[in-house]
């Protein structure tokens, strides 16, 4: 879920909200976002529809696609700084796609240098325990001790199954509250569209590094609400409403 949200948020902020976005893909060795960018470029090359769509988008917003800087947790900040210097780049926001565990080498170093962490949650005991443990350690060891630049760590519900009993979510919400962690109000429903990548065979667009999601696809996805909330807590310019 992390990589998908990184891409969706980056694409909406960059292509629709007019912000200058950079993405650092430091979730090695899988580098899901870098690989997605490669597949996106391939899909555009194979599809006249996507070629026209990309041309029209460029004509309209007059900016190139956001960079995906391939790195690892140890070198992420250094690689970002090098890119900024070499390309003379200016960003309003930089998103980091990190491994989901503090045991990965360099993760603590990188999260110490960033401003906010957002963690998608799933109502599954194993996922919840690891997510909450991650959040609590960061909160206690870094934020509370002022050992970092971090201004906040926020959790949000992902893959919310309407059939799941509300008591399950309510009991986890109490655990989150007791741990004094911040939970966003936005809830992302469990929907197959989050798995849909750009394809030369289909004309609908949802998850892509080159385009924002289609308006038809975004309805009912919970993304608009999530991004408005992200912009509010991070004080990003949210004047370009969705």
Language-model features: locations:
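C-terminal boundary of histidine-terminating zinc-finger modules
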Residues: 196-227
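P-loop/Walker-type NTP enzyme "switch/lid" segment
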Residues: 4, 9-93
